[in-house]
A protein has these predicted regions:
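Membrane-helix and juxtamembrane interface regions of eukaryotic multi-pass membrane proteins
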Residues: 1-144, 158-244, 253-257, 274-275
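Arg/Lys-rich low-complexity patches in intrinsically disordered regions that function as generic
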Residues: 266-274
Length: 275
């Protein structure tokens, strides 16, 4: 049944993976796009932020708009015609998420953590082609989490560890944006999943348990990264116990030790030579 439900989407998943890979190649061709920031080539930041700013919000909003902004959309499943026009935006959102995960698998083939994280995330996306309810809630919840990832990309580019060409004011604002944005993203994402589990067709089934394990493991990892960076930064600024921890020389080691987050661009030092 699961395989039968996914089979009609194979073409869309393949096309999204190809287009996502093409986006990598396009942005990689720009001047200075291979410059490494926090161990990550700039072009991967650009592609990630493109998806987070435009792709996911656009298709989630368009899917809801197609229903006339019907609140019932959040609790609906695929219905009788999952390949019909009524679910076109939901399909593309999932295709885009899968393609985004897939595009870097070969690049980071030697990074076990990356493979585990992205492999689980892609399996989760495929699972949602069979979800009996709450499809809209998942799309919006996933978009909310991606907006948190957007603030993470911004803080890596313009935060406390960025170069001397970035002003102290901009660095601080980036840290504030991340501290607030990621915290709100995690909280809203957790609340939305709690609502998701109460929908008819999900309540009392195995769905909330399986998906909840992945969802809250993800939020726990994101929260660890979030607090590992923001807590010492603001404690140091306010003269607390974290004094001296946030203001180091060179790159922060938080990213290297942090769990990967959903759709997060993660690059190991060993991957640099392949660029």
């Amino acid at each position: 049944m699961w395989v039968d439900a996914i089979r009609p989407h194979v073409g869309g998943l393949a096309a999204a993976s190809a287009l996502s890979g093409a986006a990598n190649l396009l942005f990689r061709s720009f001047p200075n796009s291979r410059k490494v920031v926090e161990g990550v080539p700039l072009y991967l930041f650009f592609v990630a932020m493109l998806f987070q700013l435009f792709v996911y919000p656009h298709f989630a909003w368009s899917a809801w708009k197609f229903t006339g902004y019907d609140d019932g959309w959040f609790s609906q499943g695929w219905g009788a015609d999952p390949m019909g026009a009524a679910k076109q935006h939901e399909r593309v959102w999932l295709y885009a998420m899968f393609g985004f995960m897939m595009k870097d698998m070969w690049i980071f083939r030697n990074d076990l953590l990356f493979f585990l994280h992205h492999g689980i995330a892609m399996a989760g996306v495929l699972t949602f082609f069979t979800v009996p309810a709450g499809l809209g809630q998942f799309l919006v919840g996933g978009t909310v989490l991606e907006m948190g990832n957007l603030t993470y990309n911004i803080v890596l580019l313009k935060g406390k560890d960025s170069g001397p060409n970035v002003s102290p004011t901009v660095k601080h604002l980036a840290e504030v944006l991340y501290a607030i944005g990621m915290g709100v993203s995690n909280y809203v994402g957790a609340r939305m999943f709690a609502t998701f589990t109460k929908y008819d067709g999900l309540k009392g089934t195995y769905w909330p348990w399986g998906l909840g394990l992945m969802w809250f493991a993800l939020i726990a990892g994101r929260s660890h990264v979030h607090l590992s960076r923001s807590w010492p930064y603001f404690a140091q600024r306010w003269g607390g116990k974290g004094k001296g921890k946030a203001k180091g020389k060179g790159k922060s080691n938080v990213r290297d030790n942090a769990p990967a987050t959903v759709a997060e661009v993660r690059v190991t030092r060993s991957a640099k030579s392949r660029r």
